[in-house]
Amino acid sequence: MPSGIMLKQREIVLIPIPFTDLTSQKRRPAVVISSDNYNETHEDIVVVALTSNAEPRDFTITLTSDDLEQGVLKVTSMIRTDKSYTLNKSIIIKVFGRVKTHILLKIKEFLLKIIEQHNTVN
């Protein structure tokens, strides 16, 4: 991504994701969840994955173009709040949309549920 472009919370970005065997990579969309202040003061951003596989599963949020403040989705997609990544801003390929505030609130709710799940302690 060209330097000098400021990434904002709620933006939808395109990022390269490597295959698990690291032989290749594929471009995938993601939603920026780190705060604007964090994004301004750090080289990294925090994102959650976005997929066009519209099969509902735990910790997913359905996303349509109606849920966007900016941009358009070609197909109904799912936000995978269980797939979060910290990435260097330099690998961002492009910004192509921004989700509405209510979607960020849903993302936060799901992240809190993931963090607060009861686990067995050994």
Residues of each region from the PLM?
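A structural motif
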Residues: A30-V31, V47, T81, I107
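Helix-hairpin-helix/helix-loop-helix acidic hairpins
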Residues: M1-P2
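C-terminal terminal-subdomain/extension
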Residues: I5, E69-N122
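Short, charged beta-turn/beta-strand-edge "cap" motif at the junction between a beta-strand
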Residues: P18-L22
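Compact nucleic-acid interaction/catalytic patches
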Residues: T23-K26, V32-D67
